[in-house]
């Protein structure tokens, strides 16, 4: 099934466009074409990517961005499109608190 973007993922994509737009129309076009190609691939390859921060994670080739998604009834739901140059804490915070249930005991 075709991927669906959440409102937050759409906002992330707008931020990415804002970053690339001043660098030239061809750079922005290349980024958007690469992203569109990855969305086409995601339709066929959903669920094969490793999980990071509790979500499947797929890289966008040629650009330092990753697409974080979940599967709902075999439909990929894109939760975020994030710059890989963000630190791990910022990426994790994007998704809210992650609760760890299997904490080793201190005894």
Where do the language-model regions lie?
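Solvent-exposed interaction patches of small proteins and small membrane subunits
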Residues: 27-30, 50, 54, 79-80, ...
């Amino acid at each position: 099934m075709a991927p669906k973007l959440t409102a937050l993922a759409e906002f992330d994509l707008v931020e990415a466009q804002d970053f690339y737009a001043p660098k030239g129309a061809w750079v922005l076009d290349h980024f958007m074409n690469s992203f569109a190609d990855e969305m086409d691939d995601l339709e066929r390859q959903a669920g094969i990517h490793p999980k990071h921060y509790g979500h499947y994670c797929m890289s966008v080739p040629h650009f330092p961005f990753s697409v974080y998604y979940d599967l709902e009834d075999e439909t990929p739901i894109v939760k975020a499109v994030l710059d890989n140059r963000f630190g791990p804490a910022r990426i994790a915070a994007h998704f809210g608190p992650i609760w760890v249930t299997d904490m080793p005991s201190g005894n």
